[in-house]
């Protein structure tokens, strides 16, 4: 198992840095549920990566994200998770708890902010989200952006 510091967390910098993507400019997106226990991140899986703060000032945080789509160029689209409560907020989808949070706290997915990830910019230390909860997120992405 690798040990990471704030300086070498996958996705923080360089060509494999995690970046924010404009959901209306990414073109046609086909979300898919295809987790596979193959050591690679796949749509439907929760992985960890460096997520830049929205201020885009170089700061950020290593956090879990849900991979929702694979892009033709080999990158992935994902949405970030938070344990901060967002009940009643349409930009967030409640997905409950899972092994991605060692404290067992409930989580919410932010469908308002789309992240572009690179395979080498992620570390795979979480799990596959079950299809039912993934479909809740997929439905909200479809409503919001027309993604299939």
What annotation goes with each model-predicted range?
Residues 53, 83, 113-115:
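Non-catalytic surface loops within mature trypsin-like serine protease
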Residues 55-62, 67-101:
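Compact nucleic-acid interaction/catalytic patches
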Residues 30-36, 53:
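Short alpha-helix capping/helix-loop boundary micro-motifs
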Residues 1-20, 97-148:
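C-terminal terminal-subdomain/extension
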Residues 18-30:
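Terminal targeting signals and extreme-terminal segments of soluble enzymes
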């Amino acid at each position: 198992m690798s040990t990471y510091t704030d300086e070498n967390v996958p996705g923080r910098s360089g060509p494999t840095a995690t970046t924010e993507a404009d959901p209306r400019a990414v073109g046609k997106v086909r979300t898919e549920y295809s987790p596979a226990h193959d050591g690679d991140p796949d749509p439907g899986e929760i992985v960890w990566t460096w997520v830049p703060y929205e201020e885009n000032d170089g700061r950020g945080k290593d956090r879990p994200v849900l991979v929702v789509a694979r892009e033709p160029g080999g990158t992935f689209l994902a949405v970030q998770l938070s344990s901060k409560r967002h009940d009643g907020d349409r930009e967030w989808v409640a997905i409950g708890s899972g092994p991605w949070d060692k404290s067992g706290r409930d989580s919410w997915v932010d469908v308002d902010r789309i992240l572009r990830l690179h395979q080498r910019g992620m570390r795979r230390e979480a799990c596959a989200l079950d299809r039912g909860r993934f479909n809740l997120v997929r439905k909200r992405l479809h409503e919001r952006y027309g993604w299939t």
